[in-house]
Amino acid sequence: SISILLLEVFITIFYNYDSDFKKKRYSVAKKQNINFDKRSKIEFFNHIDGNDNKVIFQGIYDKAFIKKNNKNLVYWNLGQVSNTLTVHCNEIGYMNTYISDRYGFNNKDFLWDKKIENILIGDSFVHGACVKNEKNISSNINSYGSSTLSFGLGGTGPLHQLAILKEYYKLTRPKNVIYFYYEDND
């Protein structure tokens, strides 16, 4: 087991997969004449500093906010920070951002004031990870006039998603619940 640990340390120190992956993306973008924003989230944040909205970086997952009180009750954060400019990710050349809704999800807040027809439950795919908001699943469904809320969050699994469904179903009473299950990480 020591040799496996040493191998992991060696790979971590001497082989930076993330860096190689980024270089490949930059190379492909250049070949396709795509202007790729290479700024880090911190550099992007510094560029928009002074904005009236608070900024939060995506990646604060549910496990970071599990709290127990003295009665052994567990409090679990179901969404992100509400009504906040969220810097999400950059996988395809631009930094994806959105203003979260009143419950911290990637929805236009005014949708909560409508009769909801559909809710989407899932992980980063439903969240709209690294996709412009007008291209994500819920925006596409909304563009056809079917009021839809997305309760997708990257890094969540079926139990967390069930908790989201139990909490927000009663607020929305939709006609349809559409559950996205991804076999590779759920």
Sequence positions of predicted segments:
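Membrane/wall-proximal cationic-aromatic binding patches
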Residues: 19-143
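Conserved SGNH/GDSL esterase-like catalytic core that processes O-acyl groups on lipids
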Residues: 92, 118-119, 127-186
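Intrinsically disordered, low-complexity regions of eukaryotic proteins
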Residues: 10, 39, 64, 185-186
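Hydrophobic or amphipathic alpha-helical targeting/insertion segments
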Residues: 12-15, 180
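Hydrophobic membrane-insertion alpha-helices, especially the h-region
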Residues: 1-11
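Residue-identity detector for threonine
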Residues: 12, 84-86, 97, 148, ...
